[in-house]
Amino acid sequence: MLLSLYLKQHGILEKDIKHIAFRSENNTFNLQVNNQNFEDPRIQDRYTMAFLSSLTYTENCYSCKYAQKKRISDITIGDAWGSDLADEEIKNGNFFNSLSKQKKGIQLVNNLPFHVESVDLDKTVSHNHQLCYPSQAPEMRDFFFDEIKKEKEFDLLVAKIYPKVCIKQDIKKIMKKFKLY
């Protein structure tokens, strides 16, 4: 619902979408529609900003019983944020995290056709709170959804909730327009 609304407010209809991704080719978070970056990869679009700040999560994300260090699945795959691996390698998408204490999961990881390296679990967990506890709903979440129901503009609502971050991104857009960024 939210993505459709966001895209519609930017003149993109769902029926015209053949491909959608939330990471650009340099592995930064950035909305892509039909293999085109929605925004310059150095500039964060409002949809991605709202998602990464936990504003647009579903209600169950704020009370997820699986958001803890103790894993119940055979394997958990995620980003390698906070690990000892080179930032450039992580940025290029050459690394991901897999957590597993289960025999099946360990076998699966060991049989992957890539180089596998152990990292400090505590460091990685400290950079990805979902591995410790559920996301916390932002203070303005209810306001955001109340206004969305009234068909208010997505971008303006995000700017109202996160003015400093949005101003910074808007300055980048202006600088890019004048070839200063």
Predicted regions and their residues:
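Contiguous mid-protein beta-loop-alpha structural module that forms a pocket-lining wall or clamp
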Residues: 1-16, 20
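Long, compositionally biased charged/polar accessory segments in the mid-to-C-terminal portions
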Residues: 15-181
